Amino acid sequence: VDWQEPTADSKVRPMPADFSSDAWLKRLAEDKGPAKDDENEGDVAAVLASAKTRIDATYHNQYLNHGQLEPPSALARFNPDGSLEVWLPNQAPDMFRADIAKRTGLDPSRITLHSPLLGGFFGRHFLYDAASPYPQAIELSKAVGRPVKLIWSREEEFLRDVLRPVAAVNFRAALDNDGWPLAIEAISATEGPTEALAGKQGEKLDPTALEGLSGKSYAIPNKRIAQIYVKG
């Protein structure tokens, strides 16, 4: 294999040769902002500053592969009239058919996309670059003039999957004399999954970056939930 560094205008997101996931998690945990608040109630800073009992902790998650039940698969068939049929488990049929039309030059009306429920989805079957075998199946079917069914190996699946980004969340909490929480602060340093697909932070906070943190109904009078956006 002859490896090449991507050019400045490349859409490929390269991984540096010296990349370390442990070092990246440390970098996230030490990032101080700026942070965007999703929830901010009461006076968290004042309560934390005056509390007799305070708890500080940092938690993180690792890169997550979708790990679906079956490896990705696709079947492509060009019909005698030049139309194309593709069998492909997916979560966005219109987007996939538009992408297939762009790749083949066919009018979308001449493309039939069958969407069988295969493999378990978990977000794996959205439209990601190079994460599905259907472009290969289409090219092979066109080349040999016959239907082609393609099933990736587990190695291919894990190599080409889009991983959920890592996150480091710094928690601070203040407790009263009976051990009940008076205040909690959770600041997540991460690039949310939706932000990772877009390649940038949107005008609004990415809810997938704060899953499990925001929108909770605990009766804590002072709370702050925020995100520090760090592009991965």
Question: Predicted segments — roles?
Answer:
Residues V1-G232:
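Structural alpha/beta core scaffold segments of enzyme domains
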